[in-house]
């Protein structure tokens, strides 16, 4: 577990503070990895060429870390992998549709959306239409993903 900060393992107050900020759903395992470490893991998964197999495992809720559901960090890394892979927009949006049900707190949502640099390089009108469908959803995090994507990538004079 070289990516887990020692302080998270040894300092109960720090660990509880970290968990309280994340506000995960009950039963979600938190390893304590920081975002730079998760980005490194995501980039390694993409670079390995095995990213599709890993996404399939995550879709089936098969964690990297053994038994049980996906950890908070695995959900974060899943989103980062989607952001880092070089695929056509239609394929990326399909991956996003399978990822969004795994989004269960603000940190996963906002981390994914703010690291979605591909939005700036793709057909912004097509992505906007997709975002509109997300925002109109009654699902809390599906709607939030749409809102945060729009705030992160469409809040400019050109789009207002």
Language-model segments: residues:
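Alpha-helical scaffold domains
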Residues: 1-160
């Amino acid at each position: 577990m070289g990516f887990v900060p020692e302080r998270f393992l040894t300092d109960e107050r720090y660990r509880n503070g970290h968990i309280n900020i994340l506000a995960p759903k009950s039963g979600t395992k938190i390893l304590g990895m920081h975002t730079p470490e998760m980005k490194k893991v995501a980039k390694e998964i993409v670079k390995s060429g095995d990213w599709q197999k890993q996404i399939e495992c995550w879709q089936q809720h098969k964690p990297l870390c053994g038994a049980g559901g996906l950890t908070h960090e695995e959900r974060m890394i899943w989103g980062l992998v989607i952001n880092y892979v070089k695929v056509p927009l239609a394929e990326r949006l399909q991956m996003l549709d399978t990822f969004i049900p795994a989004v269960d707190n603000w940190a996963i949502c906002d981390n994914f959306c703010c690291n979605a640099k591909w939005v700036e390089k793709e057909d912004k009108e097509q992505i906007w239409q997709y975002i509109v469908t997300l925002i109109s959803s009654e699902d809390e995090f599906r709607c939030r993903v749409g809102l945060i994507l729009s705030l992160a990538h469409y809040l400019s004079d050109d789009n207002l």
